[in-house]
């Protein structure tokens, strides 16, 4: 059998479950009204678009999206952008909200979120189940992960990458492996992670992406459901319980393309979210959103092109080293090194620098803004200065991050809340 057909068979026999119910509490007010996977990224996308696009580009066409925390905007986005698949052709993207199938509880953990959907997975008759995190930004060919899983004879395979120990401490599941990448030990979010072989500054961290043989997964979930002391979590409970008696392997994260650096970002803090968006402004960013070989799919709103108006010496509409999305109007203002999402308006004599501006924001005249995140629907009053003095920002009720990024939301401006 050719390698292409072999991979095609593997992906056709796989059901992917994307866990998209998390809040992302380290993002503070930015996730007060939306789940983290519904958060905007890169000018026109939402975070959930990245694992979904990875599935489609990898040939996996049966996908479930598990939702829970403040899921309205996430559900609406998936229905609009991903509802065109045809069930009769064996392809679908289904939304799986917490519905108390097996108990009166909502999803209690990552493993419980899968356990409560066993009947839906079983109906699809997959040979393999892929469980994916829905709150990271990355490009990954899941077909390579599936092939490694099948060829190793594994019961479970955990996708992993090397991260600095200081970054992993308290944040990532960390594993120990042998020469064949068999997992020998696993700790969930240890405060003192064990380092990688031969590299005392790095450790092998779980990406939260797993492949299981289907019946093996069901057996382990049922056992875990009977354990009253379990946290119902893959990293805390399932993986540590199975590594001694079963074949559990690690799969090092690779780029979707040869000779290209692998890209993965955890945008779980205000600083990391801001930084990951700023990286896109590089002439050759690590994440190439313009690569036609691996497109990132999303809901395409019907919007007019961006417009730049006025060309006077003291009133010139322009954007430099920036991403400016559809429906934006830069009216006699200057935008530098910033990411502007859909339908942002920046009015005359204002300056926006080094900022991430989410959809439907209006910056009125004579404003100066830098190193900021402006949440959706903000209306910045005329003459307001943001990002130049952190004490003044805090006095206005804005949040300033550890690295000096100022977050502004509608609530902080005294506007009606509930924008998603």
UniProtKB/Swiss-Prot annotation:
The keyword Transferase applies. Keywords: ATP-binding, Carbohydrate metabolism, Glycogen biosynthesis, Glycogen metabolism, Nucleotide-binding, Nucleotidyltransferase, Transferase. GO terms for biological process: glycogen biosynthetic process. Pathway: Glycan biosynthesis; glycogen biosynthesis. Alpha-D-glucose 1-phosphate binds at residues 107, 173, 188-189, 206. InterPro entries: ADP-Glc_PPase, ADP_Glu_pyroP_CS, GlgC_bac, GlmU/GlgC-like_hexapep, NTP_transferase_dom, Nucleotide-diphossugar_trans, Trimer_LpxA-like_sf. Gene3D superfamilies: Hexapeptide repeat proteins, Spore Coat Polysaccharide Biosynthesis Protein SpsA, Chain A. It catalyses: alpha-D-glucose 1-phosphate + ATP + H(+) = ADP-alpha-D-glucose + diphosphate. GO terms for molecular function: ATP binding; glucose-1-phosphate adenylyltransferase activity. Pfam families: Hexapep_GlmU (PF24894), NTP_transferase (PF00483). Its EC number is 2.7.7.27. Homotetramer. Involved in the biosynthesis of ADP-glucose, a building block required for the elongation reactions to produce glycogen. Catalyzes the reaction between ATP and alpha-D-glucose 1-phosphate (G1P) to produce pyrophosphate and ADP-Glc. HAMAP family: GlgC. Belongs to the bacterial/plant glucose-1-phosphate adenylyltransferase family. This is Glucose-1-phosphate adenylyltransferase. It comes from Shewanella baltica (strain OS195). The gene is glgC.
């Amino acid at each position: 059998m050719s390698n292409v057909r072999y991979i095609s068979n593997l992906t056709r026999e796989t059901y992917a479950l994307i866990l998209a119910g998390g809040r992302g509490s380290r993002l503070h007010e930015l996730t007060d009204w939306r789940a983290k996977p519904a958060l905007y990224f890169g000018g026109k996308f939402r975070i959930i678009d990245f694992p979904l696009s990875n599935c489609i580009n990898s040939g996996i066409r049966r996908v479930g999206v598990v939702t829970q925390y403040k899921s309205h905007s996430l559900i609406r986005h998936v229905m609009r952008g991903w509802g065109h698949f045809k069930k009769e052709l064996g392809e679908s993207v289904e939304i799986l909200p917490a519905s108390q199938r097996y108990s009166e509880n909502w999803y209690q953990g990552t493993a419980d979120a899968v356990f409560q959907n066993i009947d839906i997975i079983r109906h699809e008759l997959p040979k393999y189940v892929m469980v994916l995190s829905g709150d990271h930004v990355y490009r990954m060919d899941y077909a390579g992960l599936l092939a490694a899983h099948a060829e190793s004879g594994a019961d479970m395979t955990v996708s992993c990458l090397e991260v600095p120990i200081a970054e992993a401490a308290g944040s990532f599941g960390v594993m120990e492996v042998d020469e064949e990448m068999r997992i020998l030990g696993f700790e969930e979010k240890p405060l003192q992670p064990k380092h990688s072989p031969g590299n005392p500054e790095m450790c092998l961290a779980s990406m939260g992406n797993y492949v299981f043989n289907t019946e093996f997964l069901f057996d382990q979930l049922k056992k875990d459901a009977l354990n009253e002391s379990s946290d119902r979590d893959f990293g805390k409970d399932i993986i540590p319980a199975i590594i001694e008696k079963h074949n559990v392997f690690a799969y090092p994260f690779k780029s979707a393309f040869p000779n290209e650096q692998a890209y993965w970002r955890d945008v779980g803090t205000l600083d990391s979210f801001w930084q990951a968006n700023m990286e896109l402004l590089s002439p050759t960013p690590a994440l190439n959103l313009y690569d036609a070989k691996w497109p990132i799919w999303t809901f395409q709103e019907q919007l007019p092109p961006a417009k730049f108006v006025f060309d006077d010496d003291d009133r010139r509409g322009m954007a430099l080293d920036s991403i400016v999305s559809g429906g934006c109007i830069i009216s006699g203002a200057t935008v530098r090194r910033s990411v502007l999402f859909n339908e942002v308006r920046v009015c005359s004599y204002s300056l926006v620098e080094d900022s991430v501006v989410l959809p439907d924001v209006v910056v009125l005249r004579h404003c100066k803004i830098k190193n900021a995140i402006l949440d959706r629907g903000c209306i910045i009053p005329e003459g307001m200065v943001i990002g130049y003095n952190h004490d003044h920002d805090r006095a206005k009720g804005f949040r300033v991050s550890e690295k000096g990024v100022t977050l502004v939301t509608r609530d902080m401006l005294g506007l009606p809340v509930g924008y998603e």
